[in-house]
Curated annotation (Swiss-Prot):
Disulfide bonds: none annotated. This is Small ribosomal subunit protein uS13. Located at the top of the head of the 30S subunit, it contacts several helices of the 16S rRNA. In the 70S ribosome it contacts the 23S rRNA (bridge B1a) and protein L5 of the 50S subunit (bridge B1b), connecting the 2 subunits; these bridges are implicated in subunit movement. Contacts the tRNAs in the A and P-sites. InterPro entries: Rbsml_uS13_C (IPR027437), Ribosomal_uS13 (IPR001892), Ribosomal_uS13-like_H2TH (IPR010979), Ribosomal_uS13_bac-type (IPR019980), Ribosomal_uS13_CS (IPR018269). Residues 101-123 have a biased composition (Basic residues). It comes from the Bacteria. Keywords: Ribonucleoprotein, Ribosomal protein, RNA-binding, rRNA-binding, tRNA-binding. Residues 95-123 are annotated as: Disordered. Part of the 30S ribosomal subunit. Forms a loose heterodimer with protein S19. Forms two bridges to the 50S subunit in the 70S ribosome. GO terms for biological process: translation. One of its GO terms (molecular function) is tRNA binding.
Length: 123
């Protein structure tokens, strides 16, 4: 099993798909990495030689931000927005949508489960 960027890649998958198991690498990025490493995207992970795996590691380490480093950078970007108290930072802090979506209805994914408010009883 190939281990790249701290992630065990599934042996039976094609290289193009296997690389997407790494956080920060999608299909397009995986194809770009394989092109730089001169590896056929249809090759199975189990069929990659040790040299090819090392070449993939080298390309990913040199050119791409993945896994923990990417997560850290995203967290720092959000923290910066919160610290400067811009609109987006305030929305992050309140747990509301950032990009202009309506919140009177919908927005449940961002706001979480409903918090019901009890009504006063009629006399």
């Amino acid at each position: 099993m190939a281990r790249i960027a701290g992630v065990d890649l599934p042996r039976e998958k094609r290289a193009e798909i296997g690389l997407t198991y790494i956080y920060g690498i999608g299909k397009a990025t995986a194809n770009e990495i394989l092109a730089k490493a001169e590896i056929n995207p249809d090759t199975r992970i189990k069929d990659l030689s040790e040299d090819q795996v090392n070449e993939l590691r080298k390309v990913i380490d040199d050119d791409f931000l993945v896994e923990g480093d990417l997560r850290r950078e995203i967290a720092l970007n959000i923290k910066r927005l919160r610290d400067i108290k811009c609109y987006r930072g305030i929305r992050h802090a309140k747990g509301l949508p950032l990009r202009g979506q309506r919140t009177k209805t919908n927005a449940r994914t961002r706001k979480g489960p409903r918090k019901t408010v009890s009504r006063k009883k009629k006399k």
